[in-house]
């Protein structure tokens, strides 16, 4: 069994009040959502790699329209990088769109560039903290009940985790006042170690939980050990990442079906957010994955 050492190596709200978000509007897809990151190659600011389809420039509204009409899912994990603006007028429009179209914004994921809650410089760390405060306000205005906050990466090897924990304590307290739970995903930096994620969550105590990401492990043995640790503290959302399918139509690169078995054995009741990470056009990938997810969650 792997141990901890293995992982070490490895704003005004009133204008929004009249537009309540759609609550559990899904019919056939259960508590299945789509991460807008699945469509990252349609956004110039999040495009990377070598996409194997004809590129076009979409906005968030287009992504949600396609997901609802072609995939049959109206529940969305929004990437902060896909918000066209953080201004009130834009957010009011997104809130109204949810009401008009039956969309449900289930989670907001921080994809801000250059922020680091584990930065050594106290002044710069405080500046980064303010950016997370602003994003929590965005989640509140959109009626989103949870938000991913990345831990960042220590700039020195002997980083005192207590400093990072203190940042999360302050964010969790603020989020509680605004109806937004703080989420840590096994993403990068400190959070790449599920043991450290658990340590932070247990130290903070309230209004904080984990988001297990199926795909963000370096090896199958690490996934075998790390995923149950992440699910122990998961309540709101998990990232059901997948990399596409092989020639036999089976999920590529890792044992995805076993991830769903871990999910079920943990008695997890939150959202399952499908996230396609690959070079193909995502719509067909998500249609197929939705069918498999429904089968595995049954």
What is the predicted role of each segment?
Residues 46, 75-76, 108, 165, ...:
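Acidic/histidine-rich catalytic cores of soluble enzymes
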Residues 75, 146, 237, 270-271:
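Residues at the N-termini of beta-strands
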Residues 273-276:
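Short acidic/histidine-rich active-site segments
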Residues 154-168:
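Active-site cleft segment of glycoside hydrolase catalytic domains centered on the general acid/base Glu
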Residues 119-120, 125, 157-161, 186-189:
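Conserved glycine-rich "GG(E/T)P / GGGxP" loop and the immediately following alpha-helix
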Residues 103, 180, 266-270:
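A short helix->loop->beta-strand "cap" motif at the edges of active sites that frequently abuts
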Residues 2-140, 176, 194, 205-209, ...:
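N-terminal pre-domain/capping segments
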Residues 139-158, 178, 183-187:
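Active-site groove signature of glycoside hydrolases
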């Amino acid at each position: 069994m792997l141990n901890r050492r293995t992982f070490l190596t490895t704003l005004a709200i009133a204008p929004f009040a009249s537009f309540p978000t759609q609550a559990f509007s899904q019919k056939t897809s259960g508590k299945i959502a789509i991460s807008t990151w699945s469509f990252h190659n349609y956004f110039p600011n999040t495009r990377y790699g070598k996409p194997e389809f004809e590129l076009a420039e979409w906005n968030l509204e287009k992504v949600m329209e396609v997901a609802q009409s072609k995939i049959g899912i109206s529940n969305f994990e929004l990437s902060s990088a896909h918000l066209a603006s953080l201004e009130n007028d834009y957010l009011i429009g997104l809130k109204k769109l949810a009401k008009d179209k039956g969309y449900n914004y289930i989670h907001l994921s921080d994809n801000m560039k250059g922020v680091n809650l584990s930065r050594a410089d106290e002044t710069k760390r405080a500046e980064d903290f303010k950016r997370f405060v602003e994003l929590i306000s965005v989640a509140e205005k959109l009626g989103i009940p949870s938000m991913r906050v990345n831990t960042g990466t220590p700039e020195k090897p002997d980083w005192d985790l207590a400093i990072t924990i203190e940042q999360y304590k302050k964010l969790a307290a603020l989020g509680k006042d605004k109806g937004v739970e703080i989420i840590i995903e096994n993403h990068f930096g400190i959070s790449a170690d599920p043991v450290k994620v658990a340590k932070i969550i247990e130290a903070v105590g309230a209004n904080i939980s984990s988001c297990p990401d199926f795909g963000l492990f370096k090896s199958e043995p690490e996934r075998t050990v790390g995923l149950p640790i992440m699910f122990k503290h998961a309540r709101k959302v998990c990232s059901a990442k997948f990399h596409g399918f092989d020639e036999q139509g089976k999920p590529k690169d890792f044992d995805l079906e076993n991830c769903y078995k871990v999910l079920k054995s943990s008695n997890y009741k939150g959202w399952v957010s499908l996230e396609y990470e690959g070079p193909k056009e995502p719509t067909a990938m998500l249609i197929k994955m939705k069918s498999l997810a429904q089968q595995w969650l049954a």
